[in-house]
Amino acid sequence: MIKLKQLIAATLLLSTAFGVHAERLKDIASISGVRANQLIGYGLVVGLNGTGDQTTQTPFTLQTFNNMLSQFGIKVPAGSGTVQLKNVAAVAVYADLPAFAKPGQTVDITVSSIGNSKSLRGGALLMTPMKGVDGNVYAIAQGNLVVGGFDAEGRDGSKITVNVPSSGRIPGGASVERSVPSGFNQGNTLTLNLNRSDFTTAKRIVDKINELLGPGVAQALDGGSVRVTAPLDPGQRVDYLSILENLEVDPGQTAAKVIINSRTGTIVIGQNVKVSPAAVTHGSLTVTITEDPIVSQPGALSGGQTAVVPRSRVNAQQELHPMFKFGPGTTLDEIVRAVNQVGAAPGDLMAILEALKQAGALQADLIVI
């Protein structure tokens, strides 16, 4: 206990000795094997106000409903395949099972329609087993849905939809029935996986841990992983990790990147982006073609015929922007200021950045998403 207190005190002293840009280890890395697991299930939502599946078009909904009734000893008469169930909808149920979740605990679930239900508002999910990728049942879901959207339709065909009424959530809607085995307490080492691979950050993590616990305790496996010696006793291992995850490490600077989303026009320029000496001018040419036909009317008693003579008018207009120059080592602020001065739109800025990259003047990775 005394050694643990001394270790905590040393941790606090080392944490305060670093700059304000340091980040906690838990914010930049995770423990290998300690993660959430995805669960999925298929079930029925009942109690809808006439907004359920049109079962004549979604036969799987009616089949699921009949199978459920048969489990309660209710036999559906033959030839009932055309029954319309307006208050029932087939849904997919999915959730993330947190690490170390134990039987009896609850997790939030999301419920989404997989048929043609218009809205799940006001519905209740019936008991639905939720399986993992191995096919085993890890949780049972059931409960009333919370739907943020709604759908309304008038008799004249007018319709209004707010948000997405065909999907909802049930807070604490699934009860955990089985734990996922974890290798957390196995072996005498643990592996820390960086959220973003960086050799500088990995080295700084190793240096910080070894400075606190002694040489050789931490070892970098590569730019994204650090192996740490850990106690074998589970209780001591938890105390040990509670200290490690609160260590503050100054992460390495990210590589210079420019991210472009061509669909939305969003452009993100990283802090370390620089431009080599270059001169840029950007203009746009607009060509407008209009049809203005002329009607030719012959004189009276001339024997001629009225004719339509086609006539096209072509107008070309080019917007000229002044040329601006980038000097050596131009930074992000100067790039943004220069582009704003010429009034370039996001689409124009994309073209400018792509041209600078092709010219070898943009000292950054250009990534289009």
UniProtKB/Swiss-Prot annotation:
The keyword Signal applies. The keyword Methyltransferase does not apply. One of its GO terms (cellular component) is outer membrane-bounded periplasmic space. Residues 1-22 form the signal peptide. InterPro entries: Flag_FlgI. One of its GO terms (molecular function) is structural molecule activity. GO terms for biological process: bacterial-type flagellum-dependent cell motility. It is found in: Periplasm; Bacterial flagellum basal body. Disulfide bonds: none annotated. Keywords: Bacterial flagellum, Periplasm, Signal. The basal body constitutes a major portion of the flagellar organelle and consists of four rings (L,P,S, and M) mounted on a central rod. Assembles around the rod to form the L-ring and probably protects the motor/basal body from shearing forces during rotation. Belongs to the FlgI family. HAMAP family: FlgI. This is Flagellar P-ring protein.
